[in-house]
């Protein structure tokens, strides 16, 4: 990543005599002796990345194989899996190259490694932006399917879905390129943080509204069966728990990374903020964990997809 010094891992590996120069002027000793730094072993990071790669490859393969899954909703889920796959592959590739450089197995000039690092950074940033976009697209798709059920297939058509998907990928590539090129501009960081907040608010509003509609529907059914309280309370608790898990995981996995970006704008030289900066690799690990959890939340809950997944695993193409 290109947002702050210690995470420029490839360049730091080439010049082992001196650590990579921190970006935005953060001093190496600025964080003080009392900072809590959570170290993520490279083996654990690689293992999580590989698990994410396998999961998301299976999701893409299952959707590609089953024509019944060739619908806008599953195309959004497939693109989310591709985004998570790119995040994991890029992170694993960067870590693997860094380990090979440190071990002396791989030799490279600083200029070459700089170019490789920039390419990986663009992939990671673009995949992160597209992942957030497709999470929002899935929320919008589900919202339309509930509140405009009779008109859903006329609103969410395949051409419109493909246009939305194309726009998301183009915007992700352009924004990630600009982010890497102008990483030291405050406006770029503020745009990324604002984008995350917008996606969080969008998902929260849509899913809360969907939960309210589900509870309202349950109350109507309960009145007909004269079992209002048990049915309504049971569905309300289940829906609230699902909503809490969905938004909680999203915020837990993505929030620390964007907190890091926010603090880079607000207090890049403050010792307390420096303590947060030292845990950047932990924040990347949480994003990898999100790439592992996404298929469980959005893909594997589908019975049709699970059935196809079993066929894929049994190689019955």
Swiss-Prot record:
Cytoplasmic compartment spans: 64-72, 141-163, 212-240, 301-317
Effect in UniProt of substituting residue 22 to L: In strain: Isolate Hya36
InterPro entries per UniProt: GPCR_Rhodpsn, GPCR_Rhodpsn_7TM, Melcrt_ACTH_rcpt, MSH_rcpt
Gene3D superfamilies hit by this protein: Rhodopsin 7-helix transmembrane proteins (1.20.1070.10)
Protein location: Cell membrane
Lipidation (S-palmitoyl cysteine): 315
Record-level GO cellular component terms: plasma membrane
Residues in compartment: Extracellular: 1-37, 94-118, 184-191, 267-279
Keyword Cell membrane in record: yes
Pfam family, one: 7tm_1
Superkingdom per UniProt: Eukaryota
Chief location bin: membrane
One example GO MF annotation: melanocyte-stimulating hormone receptor activity
Bilayer topology annotation: Multi-pass membrane protein
Glycosylation (residues): 15, 29
PROSITE patterns: G_PROTEIN_RECEP_F1_1, G_PROTEIN_RECEP_F1_2
Sorted UniProt keywords: Cell membrane, G-protein coupled receptor, Glycoprotein, Lipoprotein, Membrane, Palmitate, Receptor, Transducer, Transmembrane, Transmembrane helix
Chain segments annotated as transmembrane: 38-63, 73-93, 119-140, 164-183, 192-211, 241-266, 280-300
UniProt subunit comment: Interacts with MGRN1, but does not undergo MGRN1-mediated ubiquitination; this interaction competes with GNAS-binding and thus inhibits agonist-induced cAMP production. Interacts with OPN3; the interaction results in a decrease in MC1R-mediated cAMP signaling and ultimately a decrease in melanin production in melanocytes.
Family designation: Belongs to the G-protein coupled receptor 1 family.
Function as written in the Swiss-Prot or TrEMBL entry: Receptor for MSH (alpha, beta and gamma) and ACTH. The activity of this receptor is mediated by G proteins which activate adenylate cyclase. Mediates melanogenesis, the production of eumelanin (black/brown) and phaeomelanin (red/yellow), via regulation of cAMP signaling in melanocytes.
Protein name: Melanocyte-stimulating hormone receptor
Organism per entry: Puma yagouaroundi (Jaguarundi)
């Amino acid at each position: 990543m290109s947002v702050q010094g210690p995470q420029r891992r490839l360049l730091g590996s080439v010049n082992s005599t001196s650590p990579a120069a921190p970006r935005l002027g953060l001093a190496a000793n600025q964080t003080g002796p009392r900072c809590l730094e959570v170290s993520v072993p490279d083996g654990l990071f690689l293992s999580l990345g590989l698990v994410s790669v396998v999961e998301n490859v299976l999701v893409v393969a299952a959707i590609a194989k089953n024509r019944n899954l060739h619908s806008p909703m599953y195309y959004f889920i497939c693109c989310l899996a591709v985004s998570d796959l790119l995040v994991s592959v890029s992170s694993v590739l960067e870590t693997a190259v860094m380990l090979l450089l440190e071990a002396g197995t791989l030799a490279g000039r600083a200029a070459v490694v700089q170019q490789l690092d920039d390419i990986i950074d663009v992939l990671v940033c673009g995949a992160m932006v597209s992942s957030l976009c497709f999470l929002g697209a899935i929320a919008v798709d589900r919202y339309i399917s509930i509140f405009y059920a009779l008109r859903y297939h006329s609103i969410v058509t395949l051409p419109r879905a493909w246009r939305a998907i194309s726009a998301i990928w183009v915007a992700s590539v352009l924004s990630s390129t600009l982010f890497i090129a102008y990483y030291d501009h405050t406006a770029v960081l503020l745009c990324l943080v604002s984008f995350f907040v917008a996606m969080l608010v969008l998902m929260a509003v849509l899913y809360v509204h969907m939960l309210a509609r589900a509870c309202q529907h349950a109350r109507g059914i309960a009145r007909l069966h004269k079992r209002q309280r048990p049915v309504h309370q049971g569905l309300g608790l289940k829906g609230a728990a699902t909503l809490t898990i969905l938004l909680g995981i999203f915020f837990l996995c993505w929030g620390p990374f964007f907190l890091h970006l926010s603090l880079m704008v607000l207090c890049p030289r403050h010792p307390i903020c420096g303590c947060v900066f030292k845990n950047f690799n932990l924040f990347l690990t949480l994003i990898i964990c999100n790439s592992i959890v996404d298929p469980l939340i959005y893909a594997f809950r589908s019975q049709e997809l699970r059935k196809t997944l079993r066929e894929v695993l049994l190689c019955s193409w």
